[in-house]
């Protein structure tokens, strides 16, 4: 890592190995950042040193199937319940009872599940882009599709058509990603834009057209340096070439088991912890600004703060200053005891 303040560490037990980045005082309150698809602990490079500077012990693991953490060969190994246990084991390894948990993309359902199944392990939770509810599976979130944008005859699963594509043709969905991780990441790591508002997201066409309209690999487009540097991109590419996309894509293959797990949550799935949700205005797949997608979260989270950031899906990289400020301001109000020392 380029930043000397960030250490690389590994924790292993009989069931799993977690590689993680660590920054800040080891006796500070713990804050754990969970990345999503198809990323790495590196995705939190703008957050780790910032929160370490506030006195937190800031941690970001490679989630299972990614980077230098354990990679598994069966879809069912990527159930949410498994990832939740990975994180609880990591917390035990750090010898602390609680943490502030922060998630993005698939990291969010893990954070929501920790909060709803193990609230005693949380000071509070923050999620970026993905509201509470997606851990209940594809059929559940389809109910909240905006049919003005996604007519049911054209897009039965709305913006989630790409998830159907994984279920119906997993190998076909994964093959073009494995063919060239470099062009794949350059194609998807892009800033948000207001131009896509009130139009179907690209993910809505994947089931009919494939990820890249029938191409055998992602188109060769310039890297968006507002999201990622060449050095950072090379790190992502190295590990996706080594591990492949089977693990990352398998996270999408467990909707039924994830629903079963969510039904076991405490307190009828209500979350009474201090909760912050950051919505990305230009994230048109996880669209929560004008659609009903965030309704279950608003019904089930009793201490919820929401804020909209003018960014696309890769919100923590595109607008790190705004994201860090929003989290810090929320902490001063919701968890002041963590910032007083």
Model-derived regions, located:
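Catalytic active-site module of serine/aspartate enzymes centered on a nucleophile-bearing elbow/loop
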Residues: 301-341
């Amino acid at each position: 890592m380029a930043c000397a303040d960030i250490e690389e560490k590994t924790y292993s037990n009989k069931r799993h190995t977690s590689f993680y980045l660590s920054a800040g005082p080891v006796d500070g309150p713990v804050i754990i950042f969970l990345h999503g698809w198809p990323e790495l602990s590196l995705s939190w490079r703008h957050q780790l040193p910032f929160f370490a500077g506030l006195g937190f012990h800031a941690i970001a693991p490679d989630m299972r199937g990614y980077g230098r953490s354990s990679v598994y060969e069966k879809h069912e190994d990527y159930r949410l319940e498994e990832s939740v246990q990975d994180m609880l084991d990591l917390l035990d390894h750090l010898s602390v009872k609680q943490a502030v948990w922060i998630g993005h993309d698939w990291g969010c359902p893990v954070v929501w599940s920790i909060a709803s199944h193990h609230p005693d392990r949380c000071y509070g939770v923050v999620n970026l882009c993905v509201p509470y509810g997606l851990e209940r599976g594809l059929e559940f979130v389809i109910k909240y599709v905006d049919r003005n944008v996604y007519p049911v005859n054209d897009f039965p699963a709305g913006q989630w058509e790409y998830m159907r594509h994984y279920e119906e043709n997993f190998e076909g969905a994964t093959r073009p990603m494995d063919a060239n991780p470099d062009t794949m990441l350059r194609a998807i790591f892009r800033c948000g834009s207001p131009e896509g508002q009130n139009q179907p997201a690209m993910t809505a066409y994947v089931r009919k057209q494939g990820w890249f309209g029938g191409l055998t690999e992602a188109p060769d487009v310039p890297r968006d340096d507002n999201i990622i540097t060449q050095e950072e991109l090379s790190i992502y590419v190295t590990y996706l070439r080594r591990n492949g996309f089977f693990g990352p894509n398998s996270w999408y293959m467990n909707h039924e088991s994830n629903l079963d797990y969510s039904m076991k949550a405490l307190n009828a799935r209500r979350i009474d912890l201090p909760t912050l949700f950051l919505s990305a205005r230009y994230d048109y797949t996880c669209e929560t600004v004008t659609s009903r997608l965030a309704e279950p979260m608003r019904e089930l989270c009793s201490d919820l703060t929401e804020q909209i950031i003018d960014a696309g899906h890769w919100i923590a990289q595109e607008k790190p200053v705004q994201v860090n400020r929003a989290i810090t301001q929320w902490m001063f109000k919701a968890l002041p005891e963590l910032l007083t020392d």
